[in-house]
Amino acid sequence: MFRIVNGEDYSPAVQQRNILDFGKAPSLLWTDNGSSNDRCDTGGNGRESGQDRVKRPMNAFIVWSRDQRRKVALENPQMQNSEISKRLGYDWKMLTEAEKQPFFEEAQRLRAMHRDKYPGYKYHPRRKPKRPQESLPADSSVLCSRTHIEETLYPFTYKDGCAKATRSRMESQLSHSQPTNISSSLLPQEHRSSWTILRHNRVTQATQTCGRPLLL
């Protein structure tokens, strides 16, 4: 007669994790009269204790791995449960369909017994509670790092803005520092001086380019 372990629920998604506890949990005998200590289903909302939950029937892999786990643990006392589980999973894949067939039949029988005993049973997986997200403090270091990131992403915008601001400040200072009673007679002289310098620069540039002076 096969035995089941009164442990965690066995779903395909978590069976690799659940088989780690088979060597530790107490086992119970399956009987045809349904006298095993199964509990009624509470809906799985997490408010009731684990003793009020109905355990899922074992699948073929769990049926096969119970005795195999004990055997591997006895042969390798130093092997950890995670290593044993990996080995059992590999050994199960290496079995042929004919070798797996008896365990599939036993798992089907256990499901039928479970369905007859709990006709309204519905599996409710346990959900992990969500952790609240921690809010970051908006201190000066965070603001500085955010400004640095934005400056890295948009360097030209920041540089152009700084240049425009600097130029506007310089023009403002120059406008306030210059006297208001500038004589209008100085303007033609400044214009002639600027024109002379510009003409000299153009002649020098033409001489360097063509090897002869450019007549204007």
From Swiss-Prot:
BP terms from Gene Ontology: cell differentiation; male sex determination; sex differentiation
GO cellular component: cytoplasm; nuclear speck; nucleus
Keyword vocabulary terms for this entry: Activator, Calmodulin-binding, Cytoplasm, Differentiation, DNA-binding, Nucleus, Sexual differentiation, Transcription, Transcription regulation
Complex formation: Interacts with CALM, EP300, HDAC3, KPNB1, ZNF208 isoform KRAB-O, PARP1, SLC9A3R2 and WT1. The interaction with EP300 modulates its DNA-binding activity. The interaction with KPNB1 is sensitive to dissociation by Ran in the GTP-bound form. Interaction with PARP1 impaired its DNA-binding activity.
Main function: Transcriptional regulator that controls a genetic switch in male development. It is necessary and sufficient for initiating male sex determination by directing the development of supporting cell precursors (pre-Sertoli cells) as Sertoli rather than granulosa cells. Involved in different aspects of gene regulation including promoter activation or repression. Binds to the DNA consensus sequence 5'-[AT]AACAA[AT]-3'. SRY HMG box recognizes DNA by partial intercalation in the minor groove and promotes DNA bending. Also involved in pre-mRNA splicing.
Annotated InterPro entries: HMG_box_dom, HMG_box_dom_sf, SRY, SRY-related_HMG-box_TF-like
Single GO MF descriptor: DNA-binding transcription activator activity, RNA polymerase II-specific
Subcellular location: Nucleus speckle; Cytoplasm; Nucleus
DNA-binding region of this protein: 54-122
Keyword Transcription in annotation: yes
CDD domains: HMG-box_SoxA_SRY (cd22034)
Protein name: Sex-determining region Y protein
Any one Pfam family match given in the protein's UniProt record, by short name: HMG_box
Homology family: Belongs to the SRY family.
Region Disordered: start-end pairs: 31-54, 119-139
Gene: SRY
UniProt feature coiled coil, ranges: none
